[in-house]
Amino acid sequence: MDAFTRAWYALERHYQDTCHILLRDRFAAEPDRFERMHERLDGMLFDYSKNRFGEDTLQLLCRLAETADLEGKMRALRTGAKVNGSEGRAALHTALRLPDGADAVYADGRDVLPEIRRELNRALKFAHSLDDGLYQGITGKRIADFVHIGIGGSDLGPAMCVQALEPFRRQISVHFVSNADPACLDEVLCRLNPETTMFCVASKSFKTPETLLNAEAVKAWYRGAGFSESETAHHFCAVSADTEAAQSFGIAAERVFAMYDWVGGRYSVWSPVGLPVMVAVGGARFRELLAGAHAMDSHFFHTPPRRNIPVLMALIAVWYNNFQHADGQTAVPYSHNLRLLPAWLNQLDMESLGKSRASDGSPAACKTGGIVFGGEGVNCQHAYFQLLHQGTRLIPCDFIVPMTAQGAEDGRSRFTVANAFAQAEALMKGKTLDEARAELADLPEAERERLAPHKEFPGNRPSNSILLDRLTPCNLGMLMAAYEHKTFVQGAIWNVNPFDQWGVEYGKQLAKTIIGELEGGTSVHDASTEGLMAFYRECRLKGGGAA
């Protein structure tokens, strides 16, 4: 039996030996539990004391990480080794946020930092030219709106950042279009003036069908407004790894910005894919975002596992996913401006870790990626928190809470923070049947006994609390990088590749065939798919409006 398997079995035995210990009892027996089980990094505090484990558990989890060669895999990530084995690529998103003066970073034998610096500076300069009015629309009017057309990693990260940093927004309004459903683009275009709008087409391959369909629809919008092809091109820029394809689409080379084969889409907001963030908040704020992410990178690469925030986040996730058989995990930002964070995390975690094959192609040896969902607190308390508190499923929760409001401070911010703290405490402590009876002491005994079971809360429901002193570009960068590295560590322990996404491709492949077949002709599919296609054609014949 190898060392990793022994470490795994030790954790399984440990769970059986300790699963009866309640969190409320741990806190009662360990007055210093919070002091021992929280970490701070600049403006961030990570509290993991409300989890179903003790110091002995953490030691066993760290041993598991050691036997999985986490240290070696982290070194490979940092130094440009081809950690994305199925595609034969490095994953150098951390290089995108290195400060000036950093040591060389190599991919395929060449230092990538000069290229990173060049493209970042080009994108920042272009964003500044829009903001300053130096680059104007073809009719000489200032650009007032910037529309980013992308999907998946080219959309979720930038959209989340722009929303999160709304208080830092400058004068240009930034919009996002991702879905190929015509309503997605139409609801944006109806508010815009073609003379004062810049469109950015973001696609790593410049073959993404949803993105190109929307870009072509924008061209048609300009034609309908009387613009020539060259006049329309003046209102386009692009971000792609295939810069020649972007230029073939009609976008001038000086407005095509490079992204890189060695950065996956869901890790690309730090590259020129972050152009809408640069436009929204300015170059200085974007550099603060990069600096925050780099601060977390430095912490991750140079801090021992027991004090390492992303490593701890990952080990906790592995503990629940593999040894306590949790049914999922939820992330709840108690900040209106962070309301898109759960969608970004959903892609980051589930697209990265939703793998049934190990890195070498063999079947995965354990349960891998979990179901990640979430929503905006306090709203979630009036939705799915009932299941968290009294349901039969184990779903650990991350509470992400800025301490300072970004709006008017009139008591609502304090209310929001108080609710986050209260929910975490309620999940941990629960309410015993006797405590429920005591609350109902004024009722007749029969009524008290009838109601008390419904007011009992099992408790012992785990959570992490991630507190930010303020929601700033720097703190947002730290938060995002922490979750990126958490995802990497989980992949390292489960021995899956978190940087590919072959499962996304198969449906796209079938869709290419079905698109043509929807208009009629020969098709050979299963009976269900044929029936769905027949209903589509029926609706078209009746004038149902499908397109």
UniProtKB/Swiss-Prot annotation:
Broad class of enzyme this protein falls into: isomerase
Keywords associated with the record: Cytoplasm, Gluconeogenesis, Glycolysis, Isomerase
Keyword Cytoplasm included in the entry's annotation: yes
Main localization (coarse): cytoplasm
Subcellular location: Cytoplasm
Source species, domain of life: Bacteria
SS bond list: none
The protein's Enzyme Commission number: 5.3.1.9
Active site, per annotation: E351 (proton donor), H382, K508
Catalytic reactions of this protein: alpha-D-glucose 6-phosphate = beta-D-fructose 6-phosphate
Parts of the chain that traverse the membrane: none
Example GO biological process: gluconeogenesis
Pathway the protein takes part in: Carbohydrate biosynthesis; gluconeogenesis; Carbohydrate degradation; glycolysis; D-glyceraldehyde 3-phosphate and glycerone phosphate from D-glucose: step 2/4
GO CC annotation terms, alphabetical: cytosol
Described purpose of this protein according to its UniProt entry: Catalyzes the reversible isomerization of glucose-6-phosphate to fructose-6-phosphate.
Protein name, as recorded: Glucose-6-phosphate isomerase 2
Origin species: Neisseria gonorrhoeae (strain ATCC 700825 / FA 1090)
